[in-house]
């Protein structure tokens, strides 16, 4: 199969994997309602500088994903499909970019195609590329920067590579506008480890090898600096401190106690059995098999460092989530594909002595094609049937439909101490901002003002008098209560 045919096949498979049935289910879990709500609020307010949630600045990360989601809402309407488009395109571009760059590295079309296919069909990569959020964009930015860096510094060393360095800058720009300091640290730690290995191996320090990525990184940070300047214009130093220190350094060091997701240092070690499913075994066996070749094979060394250095960085961070491993997926796919290629050569060498090996060699195309189609069919089935079924437990639509029904009746519905997911879901589905109350005194005053006033609240236990429950809706493991003042029923 030619490289062109493979690339077209990958394009078709990736479009199927990332876009088919993308909008057949509602916003689910915690991240999707929150990010979609921020995007809807940006669309409604027309404030494209400061991301807001429930009319409050929300600066956990820079706003690239929210910009794209808000633009999609403006173009296609406020639907789950629209706000998932950015992640889906990020997944698609990551797969196609990996294939193209591996071919530029001189790898056979078969190896490049298998690596790209394994990336597209890693369970965590696939699922996160179909969800609202910034993680797919972060993975695209990090992989773009690292692949371009390796091409410019190793493959085309001592040759003009301005295009590759500009691609490197684009990757850094995407990753930093998606995740801030982490988007700079993840490719940065790999590049640092690579340059140290290069210096040790050649027993000399080449200053230009260090200065070149630094200069193009400065170029890449210009879009982030422009946004920070505009943010400063709207909110001053407090907003800059929140995005640069509290939500970046604070989350890494653990000093920001409200960030959450705190896990022990061994958290990611316990997640290794599921990190790169279904290709885990090939990844880890490949790392072991290639360990003695690393210093002689710069290509294998680079992708091993992509895994190890980023894994170490994430392990040292206080805030940990399984989704953060998504940026390691391209390197894992490359190592898995390279080891699969080694296994294929071993089977071919034994074909003369083993009937089973000979059968596999004779029918390898049919076997591989069938296996790939079965994997794709499995993911398509999950997208078509499993995700919509989860709506019964995870969708906020029944809750927001109830809010709308009360509003149609002339009731004034307000939120009491809403969680991020509740605030996001309410603004996304209602395409409007509900009033919010923070203190219990505000709640009492609101309910006493009119018998038509209804408060929506989340509670682990049923609210007690003087509150009266008029309805409740369960979303996942959380229960949301619609309450009025009990005194209204005393008459």
Q: Where are the model-predicted features located?
A:
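Short, solvent-exposed mixed-charge patches
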Residues: 489-491
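Alpha-helix N-cap/loop-to-helix boundary motif
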Residues: 300, 328, 332, 365-370, ...
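Short periplasmic/luminal acceptor-recognition loop of GT-C membrane glycosyltransferases, typified by
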Residues: 375-486
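Membrane-integral, polyisoprenol-dependent glycosyltransferases
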Residues: 1-349, 353, 385-389, 424-427, ...
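N-terminal secretory/membrane-targeting helices
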Residues: 15, 119, 169, 179, ...
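Short secondary-structure transition/capping segments
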Residues: 97, 352-357, 367-368, 456-466
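Signature aromatic-anchored transmembrane alpha helix within multi-pass, membrane-resident enzymes
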Residues: 341-382
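Extended hydrophobic-aromatic, low-complexity segments
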Residues: 322-325, 336-337, 345, 368, ...
């Amino acid at each position: 199969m030619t490289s062109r045919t493979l690339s077209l096949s990958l394009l078709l498979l990736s479009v199927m994997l990332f876009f088919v049935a993308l909008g057949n289910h509602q916003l689910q879990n915690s991240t999707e309602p929150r990010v979609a709500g921020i995007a809807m609020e940006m669309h409604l307010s027309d404030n494209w500088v400061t991301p807001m949630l429930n009319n409050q600045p929300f600066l956990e990360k820079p706003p690239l994903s929210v910009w794209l989601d808000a633009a999609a809402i403006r173009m296609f309407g406020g639907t789950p499909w629209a706000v998932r488009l950015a992640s889906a395109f990020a997944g698609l571009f990551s797969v196609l970019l990996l294939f193209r760059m591996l071919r530029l590295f001189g790898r056979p079309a078969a190896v490049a195609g298998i690596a790209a296919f394994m990336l597209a069909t890693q369970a965590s990569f696939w699922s996160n590329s179909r969800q609202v959020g910034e993680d797919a964009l972060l993975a695209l930015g990090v992989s773009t920067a690292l692949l371009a860096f390796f091409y410019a510094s190793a493959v085309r060393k001592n040759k003009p590579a301005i295009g590759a360095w500009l691609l490197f800058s684009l990757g850094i720009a995407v990753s930093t506008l998606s995740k801030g300091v982490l988007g700079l640290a993840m490719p940065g730690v790999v590049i640092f480890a690579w340059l140290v290995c290069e210096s040790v191996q050649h027993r000399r320090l080449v200053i230009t090898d260090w200065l070149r990525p630094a200069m193009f990184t400065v170029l890449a940070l210009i879009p982030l600096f422009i946004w920070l300047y505009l943010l400063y214009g709207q909110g001053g130093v407090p907003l800059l401190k929140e995005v640069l220190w509290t939500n970046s350094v604070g989350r890494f060091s653990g000093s920001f106690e409200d960030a959450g997701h705190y896990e022990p240092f061994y958290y990611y070690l316990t997640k290794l059995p599921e990190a790169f499913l279904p290709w885990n075994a090939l990844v880890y066996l490949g790392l072991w098999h290639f360990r003695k070749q690393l210093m002689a094979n710069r290509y294998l060394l680079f992708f091993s460092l992509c895994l190890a250095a980023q894994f170490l960085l994430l392990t040292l961070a206080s805030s940990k989530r399984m989704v953060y491993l998504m940026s390691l997926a391209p390197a894992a796919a490359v190592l898995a594909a390279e080891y699969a290629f080694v296994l294929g050569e071993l089977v071919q060498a034994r074909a003369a002595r083993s009937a089973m090996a000979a059968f596999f060699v004779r029918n390898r195309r049919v076997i591989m094609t069938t296996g790939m189609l079965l994997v794709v069919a499995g993911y398509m089935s999950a997208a078509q049937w499993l995700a919509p079924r989860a709506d019964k437990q995870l969708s906020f639509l029944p809750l927001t439909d109830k809010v709308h029904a009360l509003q149609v009746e002339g009731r004034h519905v307000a939120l009491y101490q809403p969680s991020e997911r509740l605030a996001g879901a309410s603004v996304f589905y209602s395409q409007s901002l509900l009033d919010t109350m923070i203190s219990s005194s505000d709640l009492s005053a609101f309910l006493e003002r009119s018998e038509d006033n209804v408060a929506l609240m989340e509670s682990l236990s049923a609210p007690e008098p003087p509150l009266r429950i008029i309805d409740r809706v369960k979303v996942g493991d959380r229960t949301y209560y619609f309450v009025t003042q009990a005194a209204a029923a005393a008459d």
